[in-house]
Amino acid sequence: MILYPSVDDLLEQVDSRYSLIMLAAKRAHDLDAGSPELLSNYESPKNIGHALEEIAAGKVKIKED
């Protein structure tokens, strides 16, 4: 269970829980592959936590087609 960032904070950045999970998984995969981190400080030690923190900060968005 995640404590930070809260699901409510995350859902302010995306339309649905499904979109949130897909965006977080994609960003975590990108971080695993060596993409640069977008924040200077992270509370979580894992890439999925980094992805969620970046989403909450508004640094990662879903690309609209």
UniProtKB/Swiss-Prot annotation:
The RNAP catalytic core consists of 2 alpha, 1 beta, 1 beta' and 1 omega subunit. When a sigma factor is associated with the core the holoenzyme is formed, which can initiate transcription. It comes from the Bacteria. Promotes RNA polymerase assembly. Latches the N- and C-terminal regions of the beta' subunit thereby facilitating its interaction with the beta and alpha subunits. This is DNA-directed RNA polymerase subunit omega. Pfam families: RNA_pol_Rpb6. Its EC number is 2.7.7.6. GO terms for biological process: DNA-templated transcription. InterPro entries: DNA-dir_RNA_pol_omega (IPR003716), Pol_omega/Rpo6/RPB6 (IPR006110), RPB6/omega-like_sf (IPR036161). GO terms for molecular function: DNA binding; DNA-directed RNA polymerase activity. It catalyses: RNA(n) + a ribonucleoside 5'-triphosphate = RNA(n+1) + diphosphate. One of its GO terms (cellular component) is DNA-directed RNA polymerase complex. It is an enzyme of class 2 (transferase). Keywords: DNA-directed RNA polymerase, Nucleotidyltransferase, Transcription, Transferase.
